[in-house]
Design a protein with these regions (language model features):
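Active-site-proximal cap/lid insertion segments
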Residues: 2-29, 35-175, 179, 187-197
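Glycine-rich, aromatic-lined ligand/substrate-binding cores of catalytic
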Residues: 183
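Short, intrinsically disordered, charge-balanced linker/junction segments flanking boundaries
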Residues: 197-205
Length: 205
């Protein structure tokens, strides 16, 4: 994290050593690139695997596009009970930026979903939404992720796949971890999970 700017990240193409940057807010530019890729997949004979790794929301939180920052500039948020009183103002400021980023990401996910539908891929594509960690945002008097409290380690794990879960979906209280993602995806696609894999296949749940 000392060498990588999550709000202005670099990338490389192919074997080139040239460092490139997206022209606008990372999440928006990356989403546009993904949508361009999806346009090539509507009639493709082979399945595809794609990862969109959005860096935001990430400290510093004041880097979302201006229109999203304005949505929350006067917002007063409900603060968790475990935020010390002397950290409340600090938490309010951070949450305004955090939610600005999250709203931008929400729009990006909506754009992706629209493109999947436009290309007829929405019913036969497994969509996974998750995160590597949460942020404490003032809880326990801390800010980022370095301490293993619930605010840091409990993250969403959402799968959209009507073929497996039906049109209304399902909810589970199962405790899933990062090593379980790959075997679960293999299970959903009917591929045998190698015995050497550490994680568990949760697709039957």
């Amino acid at each position: 994290e000392c060498t990588h700017d999550y709000n202005h990240s670099a990338y490389y193409e192919g074997n080139s050593k040239e460092k490139k940057y997206w022209e606008s807010y990372d999440a928006i530019s990356q989403t546009q690139d993904v949508c361009q890729f999806l346009k090539t997949q509507s009639n493709a004979s082979d399945p595809f695997f794609l990862v969109l790794s959005i860096g935001s929301p990430h400290d510093p939180y004041n880097t979302a596009p201006e229109k999203y920052q304005k949505m929350y500039e006067n917002k007063i948020f409900a603060i968790r009970d475990n935020v010390p009183k002397d950290k409340i103002e600090w938490a309010q400021k951070g949450l305004r930026g955090y939610y600005a980023h999250m709203t931008a990401i929400d729009d990006c996910i909506g754009q992706l979903w629209k493109e999947l539908k436009n290309q007829g891929l929405d019913e036969n594509t497994i969509i996974v939404f998750t995160s590597d960690h949460g942020d404490l945002m003032g809880s326990h008097g801390a800010w980022n992720k370095q301490q293993p409290y619930d605010e840091s380690i409990r993250v969403p794990f959402l799968i959209h796949y009507p073929k497996a879960f039906g049109p209304t979906g399902k909810k589970s209280k199962a405790l899933i971890n990062s090593p379980d993602i790959m075997p679960t995806l293999l299970g959903l696609t009917g591929i045998e999970v190698p015995k050497s894999v550490e994680g568990k296949d949760f697709s039957p749940i």
